[in-house]
Structures are given as structure tokens and as C-alpha cells.
């Protein structure tokens, strides 16, 4: 999260996004085209600091939303029309700097991986069974603890390979975003992330995997990058080797969240409020 809302970050990231997309070596056609004009729903009441979203399986037509540092340890249930339905407290955990979210199988993962000042000694990924309509409080939470081999890093995106269960962590503020891996099975105490590669751009703020695990979206402030599995590649392989293509994206005030729809019919984005007067939920449907 960027509490000071430095608009230069967004501007330079946008320029980098355009430059990266201009390389023909880094593009691939998407099998199913995506609408360039998204649907837009005003979020009511406003969610100020959305940092991760996931499209619900237990409650079709709804998204789970988390906010980052300085906000309660809770889930926000948001319907596809932009209405906040309820808030669900999560017991036994702290929101130090929650920065991304993923729904894998029936487990909802919350990534406490942000570290703007790069001073943290360890980081946390919480997971628990996806809530249902009758859930008022989440209490049975598991945690994956990890550290980096070379000190502290600020990360705002992660992906979980549904086949290997390995977790890929993507840093934000390195010159080029670096990719670290947590290898499954995870130790109950401390895990060490291993550097496995770099992306060709910086300022990654969110990432999402399609329901079938064959597509990934990596988000910066100014762009959405689409990766597609070839043959039977692992997520790590097709993310690091590419190629990739820029997806349609309406620039948001401080957009830090992306997720595929649970039916794989498109993707959602949701921004922090930043300096804007309102927040909108965007959906880009496949044609």
C-alpha cells in the first residue's frame, strides 16, 4: 500500500507498461477475446483500501475483499453489483499489511506480505475454509510463515500452483519484480523463500490465477499482463518464460486488486480509493 498516494508511481509504471507491451517477443494471442469496455458498478458503501479480491465459490455473485494495513482483520463480502453485504471478523490474526488474496479449492488465502519500509523479519500467509452465508466469524485459521534468504522485501502479489501447491511471491519495488518460491509441503514453523526468477517489469501489485490454473494475470498500476499455460507447464515455468500479452484495463485511482471470475467468464478489478471521490468495481467479460 502507498499511504501517501504518490501519483508519479502510477505514471511511471504506466509508461513502463506501454514499453513492455510494445515488444512482439512478449506477446501472445488470447484464445477468447476480452471486452475492452468493462462493466462498472459503484461500490456502496465505499471500501477505502481494497488490496485483494477473490470471486466466491460458496456464494456465487459475490466477491471476497480484504483491506491492507491499518484496517481490521476482516473479510468484506461484496456482491457483483457493488453493494457491501457484510463484514466477517477473522479471529487470532493481525492485519500488518495484507496485500493479496487467492481462493484455491475450498481454501481462502490472505497474504500478509507487504513491507513498504522493508524492515520485517518474517511474513505470513493465512488460510482457512471459504466462509458460507451462515459464517459470522472466521476462527479456525492456519498460517504459513516465511522469510527471504537476503533480508526484507515488499511484495503485493502471490500465486498458488493448484498442482504442486507451491506459492510464488512477486515483489513490488525492485528494479524488476522478482519471483520467490515457497515449496510445498510447508514447514509448520518457518519457511525460506527461494529466488527463482524476475519479470520484465516492476510495480506488481496483484496477481490472479484462472479457475482451471491455465491462465494467470499479473497486475501493475498501469497494466494487466496475461500469461497462458502451454502443454503441461507448471505455473512457475509459464510465468517466468512467458510470453505474455497486455489485457484491456481501465486505469484506476490506485488499482491493487485483480481476480478471475469463478466461472472463468472474465476478470474483476477493484481499486483503493486513493484521491478519488468514489470506488468502482470493474468486470471485463470474455466475448
What annotation goes with each model-predicted range?
Residues 1-34:
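Bacterial Sec-dependent N-terminal signal peptides
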Residues 22-287:
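Sequence/structural signature of beta-propeller domains
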Amino acid at each position: 500500500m502507498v499511504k501517501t498516494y504518490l501519483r508519479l508511481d502510477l505514471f511511471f509504471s504506466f509508461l513502463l507498461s506501454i514499453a513492455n507491451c510494445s515488444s512482439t517477443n512478449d506477446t501472445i494471442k488470447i484464445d477468447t477475446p476480452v471486452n475492452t469496455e468493462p462493466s462498472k458498478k459503484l461500490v456502496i458503501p465505499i471500501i477505502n483500501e481494497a488490496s485483494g479480491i477473490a470471486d466466491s465459490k460458496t456464494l456465487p455473485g459475490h466477491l471476497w475483499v480484504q483491506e491492507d494495513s491499518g484496517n481490521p482483520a476482516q473479510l468484506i463480502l461484496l456482491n457483483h453489483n457493488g453493494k457491501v453485504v457484510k463484514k466477517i471478523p477473522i479471529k487470532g490474526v493481525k492485519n500488518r499489511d495484507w496485500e493479496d488474496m487467492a481462493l484455491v479449492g475450498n481454501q481462502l488465502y490472505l497474504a500478509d506480505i507487504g513491507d513498504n519500509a522493508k524492515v520485517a523479519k518474517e511474513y505470513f500467509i493465512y488460510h482457512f475454509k471459504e466462509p458460507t452465508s451462515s459464517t459470522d466469524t472466521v476462527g479456525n485459521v492456519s498460517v504459513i510463515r516465511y522469510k527471504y534468504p537476503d533480508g526484507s522485501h515488499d511484495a503485493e502479489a502471490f500465486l498458488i500452483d493448484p498442482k504442486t501447491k507451491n506459492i510464488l511471491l512477486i515483489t513490488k519495488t525492485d528494479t524488476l519484480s522478482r519471483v520467490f518460491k515457497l515449496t510445498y509441503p510447508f514447514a509448520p514453523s518457518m519457511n525460506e523463500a527461494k529466488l527463482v526468477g524476475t519479470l520484465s517489469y516492476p510495480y506488481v501489485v496483484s496477481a490472479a490465477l484462472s479457475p482451471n490454473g491455465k491462465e494467470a494475470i499479473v497486475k501493475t498500476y498501469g497494466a494487466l499482463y496475461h500469461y497462458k499455460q502451454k502443454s503441461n507447464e507448471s505455473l512457475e515455468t509459464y510465468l517466468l518464460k512467458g510470453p505474455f500479452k497486455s489485457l484491456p484495463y481501465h486505469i484506476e485511482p490506485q488499482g491493487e486488486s485483480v481476480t478471475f471470475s469463478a466461472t472463468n467468464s472474465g476478470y474483476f478489478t477493484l481499486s483503493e480509493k486513493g484521491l478519488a471521490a468514489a470506488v468502482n468495481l470493474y468486470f471485463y467479460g470474455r466475448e
